[in-house]
UniProtKB/Swiss-Prot annotation:
Gene that this sequence comes from: rplM
Record's function text: This protein is one of the early assembly proteins of the 50S ribosomal subunit, although it is not seen to bind rRNA by itself. It is important during the early stages of 50S assembly.
Protein name: Large ribosomal subunit protein uL13
Domain of life: Bacteria
Species in which this protein is naturally found: Wigglesworthia glossinidia brevipalpis
Coiled coil: none
Gene Ontology molecular function terms on file: mRNA binding; structural constituent of ribosome
Amino acid sequence: MKTFMLKKNIARQNWHIFDAKNKILGRFSTKLASILKGKNDITYTPHVDSGNYVIVINSKKIKITGKKLKNKFYYHHTGYSGGIKKISLENMIKNNSELVIYKSVKGMLPKGSLGRVMIKKLKIFSGESHNHEAQKPKKLLT
């Protein structure tokens, strides 16, 4: 019997919804990355995008352990000389909590074209409501 290899045209992708309230950032992100890759399906194939769509609500209420709120910094560069900027995790959660989960999950996905396709399937909202009710997302236990 031959090994089953999933083809792109027969891959079925479902929508799942997760509540980030009181979830630990790293453990929560690994679960999301695994579902985006498609590892929770029996038809997982590494080179095909078989992952599901993921909706995250309540990103503002995610839990950070230890002293990371004060000691963890995110850096970016404007492109100008002396243009390095840094922001603490505490300020990032206050200003743009969606970006914290986005960066955490993106770091756990493949670093190529397949990873760029997978990260587009992650939809993050800071509040309770989202605009994907039409897709009828299923709630998975985490």
